[in-house]
Regions:
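RecA-like P-loop NTPase motor core
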Residues: 1-58
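Nucleic-acid enzyme cleavage-core boundary/entry regions
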Residues: 6-13, 17, 44-51, 149-201
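Short acidic, S/G/P-rich loop/turn micro-motifs used as interaction or catalytic elements
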Residues: 6-8, 64-68
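Hydrophobic, Leu/Ile/Phe/Ala-enriched alpha-helical segments that form helix-helix packing faces
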Residues: 17-22, 79-84, 112, 196-200
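Short coil/loop linkers at secondary-structure junctions
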Residues: 20-24, 89, 162
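A short acidic, often aromatic-flanked loop/helix-cap motif at beta-alpha or helix-coil junctions
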Residues: 35-41, 97-104, 174
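Structural beta-sheet core signal
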Residues: 59-61, 94
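Activity-critical C-terminal alpha-helical subdomain
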Residues: 66-161
């Protein structure tokens, strides 16, 4: 996965999905610390060793957006070219749905229980509009608008939870297995689940 390590929301999100929908599957996550490291020597060696021993290797990464100088089409082309260059092949899934621009946080946001926490999302989005609309004399924004990961982190930190549960946030565990905050049955997760169903051994 694209995450830096297992103390990330991406890792815990995927782990919750696999535990819930693929309970019999044994999965080992390798964190590549950014898509730019996918084809480095260490990761290529791990991929080769895993494939030689008969293990299935799949890659999950953000498609990202044009604003980040990427996007689905460009990310896909880069991965395809790099697979040819390095003579390696593996199935891969680009968040959010293997066809559109976006990232894993796009999927997480779609699974957030907006229906149960409407007030939080309405207030936060009003805040985003207010902050992004504040400009200096030159018309440039004065403030940075929080990114989607920050919004989702704030969503969970705003919940009234016992300390024992709140302590899990520090390791990226945003309680994805808790239906009071996340709905892992939303339609937007179907492409990812179908991909996992096809490739997890």
């Amino acid at each position: 996965i694209e995450a830096k390590d297992k103390k990330t929301s991406e890792y815990h999100f995927l782990e919750a999905i696999i535990r819930l929908f693929f309970p019999g599957k044994e999965v080992d996550f390798i964190c590549m610390n950014g898509i730019g490291n996918l084809f480095n020597e260490t990761n290529l060696n791990q991929i080769s060793l895993a494939q030689e021993s008969g293990e299935q290797v799949i890659v999950l990464a953000d498609a990202d957006t044009i604003a980040k100088r990427q996007g689905y089409a460009q990310r896909k082309a880069e991965i395809e070219n790099d697979m040819v260059t390095h003579a390696v092949s593996f199935p891969y899934f680009l968040y959010p749905n293997n066809q559109d621009d976006g990232d894993v946080e796009t999927l997480m946001e779609s699974a957030a229980r907006r229906d149960l926490h409407t007030v939080f999302f309405d207030c936060f989005e009003d805040y985003e509009k207010c902050v992004s609309g504040t400009k200096d004399e030159s018309g440039n924004p004065i403030y940075n608008v929080p990114d989607l990961k920050s919004k989702l982190n704030t969503y969970m930190r705003a919940q009234k939870l016992p300390r024992k549960l709140r302590d899990r946030f520090g390791s990226g565990d945003w309680l994805f297995d808790n239906a009071d905050y996340w709905n892992l049955n939303v339609a937007t997760l179907l492409p990812l689940k179908e991909f996992l169903a096809m490739w997890l051994k």
